[in-house]
């Protein structure tokens, strides 16, 4: 299903993505919204572009899964929400950030929770379930202004990896779950559909083999300049 040619609100996107979407946001975005997600080593958090009739989000590989989530959500704002057009202006970026915040930390959810309970295990569970950083949640609370105790604010000053390590209950997520989530956001990733199309294009001579090798993250038949991992549409010749 592709909804990237329609106006979609954060609430509608949440419904389409389904329960627990933040645990593997890249896969849900592809499966439920028809937007491809690519993960590569980048010098910046990410960006979005269009290849043929498909929207593509390119995310910088990082072990900070919460950063990947917010980047994907931010780029979805540019794609799905007209007021967050990808024009590069401060207004566009602010609108995309607002979309991401409402997608991951909806106002109704934030206001339904108690932010005076000083249990760090509960705060860690909120961070894990929403798929955000302590900083992002702190910023969201500052914006929405629900009652927040000083103790909760102090907990949210804790770096996200440390809070997860020290306070996330194993009944919510195991140590292996945390590692897998971290590995997913750091692992080079290309949609299976795109890899299949690229392989077929190479086989019939419509794309260079170096393109497929680059997408797979392996040396090509002829070593290319790997000084930049930026996604170039030229590397996907034959697909569009």
Predicted regions and their residues:
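Active-site hotspot residues in diverse enzymes, especially metal/ion-binding acidic/histidine motifs
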Residues: 1-240
């Amino acid at each position: 299903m592709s909804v990237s040619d329609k106006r979609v609100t954060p609430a509608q996107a949440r419904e389409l993505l389904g329960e627990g979407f933040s645990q593997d946001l890249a896969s849900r975005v592809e499966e439920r919204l028809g937007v491809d997600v690519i993960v590569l080593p980048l010098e910046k958090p990410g960006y979005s572009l269009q290849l043929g009739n498909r929207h593509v989000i390119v995310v910088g590989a990082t072990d900070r899964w919460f950063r990947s989530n917010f980047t994907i959500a931010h780029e979805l704002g540019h794609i799905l929400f007209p007021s967050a057009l990808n024009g590069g202006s401060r207004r566009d970026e602010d609108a995309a950030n607002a979309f991401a915040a409402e997608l991951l930390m909806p106002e109704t959810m934030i206001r339904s929770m108690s932010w005076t309970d000083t249990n760090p295990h509960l705060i860690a569970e909120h961070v894990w379930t929403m798929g955000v950083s302590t900083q992002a949640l702190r910023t969201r609370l500052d914006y929405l202004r629900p009652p927040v105790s000083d103790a909760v604010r102090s907990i949210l000053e804790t770096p996200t990896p440390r809070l997860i390590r020290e306070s996330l209950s194993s009944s919510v997520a195991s140590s292996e779950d945390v590692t897998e989530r971290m590995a997913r956001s750091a692992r080079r990733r290309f949609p299976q559909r795109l890899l299949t199309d690229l392989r077929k294009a190479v086989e019939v001579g419509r794309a260079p083999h170096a393109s497929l090798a680059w997408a797979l993250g392996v040396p090509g038949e002829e070593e290319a300049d790997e000084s930049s991992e930026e996604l170039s549409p030229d590397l996907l010749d034959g697909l569009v």
